[in-house]
């Protein structure tokens, strides 16, 4: 165990030592600026972070409602037959490597966006669509787990009080599964951020 920690400390010291030129040669002000011109020696990281943030927020805005909605449909509304068909497909999509999604985006989505906007299709809108498609299966799978963890007795108590199915979903099931849904969204966001860096 101590050997493992020693290796971690050695790596940390090496990484810190290797990163020192960023602070000594470039400087913190230039490093955290919006100027990115490597040929001129300007390595501002803020434009890269802003782009990653913009694309991640757009992907979440598109992917979260679709992922949570799909999970609610599969757990609360869909028949067993539909569930048996769609659930394995969602699990399969969650395991597809990111490079495949990127290729799909370049071949299918980019030309569609280019035709729609009249541009080349290289931009935030294309990235939003690709990342949203990428994070939906992750959010859906984890939200399904969160919804399935809610005891059936809670739903039955809601029905016994006269609530409709939609009232039960909106007022009882979703609030009870809120923490699991937030976890699903955070993991989806992590995947989106990881792909934009």
Label the predicted regions:
Residues 2-9:
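Short, small-residue-biased leader/transition segments that mark boundaries at the very start
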Residues 17-59, 79-80:
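Periplasmic/extracellular loop-to-transmembrane helix junction in inner-membrane transport proteins
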Residues 48, 52, 88-91, 95, ...:
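Residue-level signal for discrete positions within transmembrane alpha-helices
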Residues 52, 56, 60-72, 76, ...:
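Hydrophobic positions within alpha-helical transmembrane segments of bacterial inner-membrane proteins
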Residues 66-105, 142:
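Cytoplasmic-entry segments and transmembrane alpha-helices of multi-pass inner-membrane transporters
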Residues 91-135:
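Generic hydrophobic transmembrane alpha-helix motif, especially the helices
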Residues 97, 161-162, 175:
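Glycine/proline-centered hinge or cleavage motifs at structural transition points of membrane proteins
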Residues 142-143, 165-197:
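Transmembrane alpha-helices
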């Amino acid at each position: 165990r101590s050997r493992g920690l020693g290796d971690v400390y050695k790596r940390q010291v090496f990484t810190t030592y290797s990163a020192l030129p960023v602070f000594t040669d470039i400087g913190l002000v230039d490093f955290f600026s919006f100027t990115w011109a490597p040929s001129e020696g300007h390595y501002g990281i803020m434009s890269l972070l802003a782009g990653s943030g913009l694309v991640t927020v757009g992907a979440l805005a598109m992917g979260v409602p679709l992922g949570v909605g799909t999970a609610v449909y599969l757990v609360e509304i869909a028949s067993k037959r539909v569930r048996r068909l769609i659930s394995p497909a969602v699990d399969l999509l969650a395991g597809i490597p990111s490079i495949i999604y990127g290729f799909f985006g370049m071949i299918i989505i980019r030309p569609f966006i280019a035709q729609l906007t009249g541009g080349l299709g290289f931009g935030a809108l294309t990235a939003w669509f690709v990342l949203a498609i990428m994070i939906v299966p992750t959010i859906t799978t984890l939200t399904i787990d969160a919804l399935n963890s809610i005891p059936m007795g809670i739903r039955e108590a809601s029905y016994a009080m006269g609530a409709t199915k939609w009232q039960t979903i909106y007022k009882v099931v979703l609030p009870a599964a809120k923490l699991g849904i937030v976890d699903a969204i955070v993991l989806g966001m992590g995947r989106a951020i990881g792909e934009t860096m």
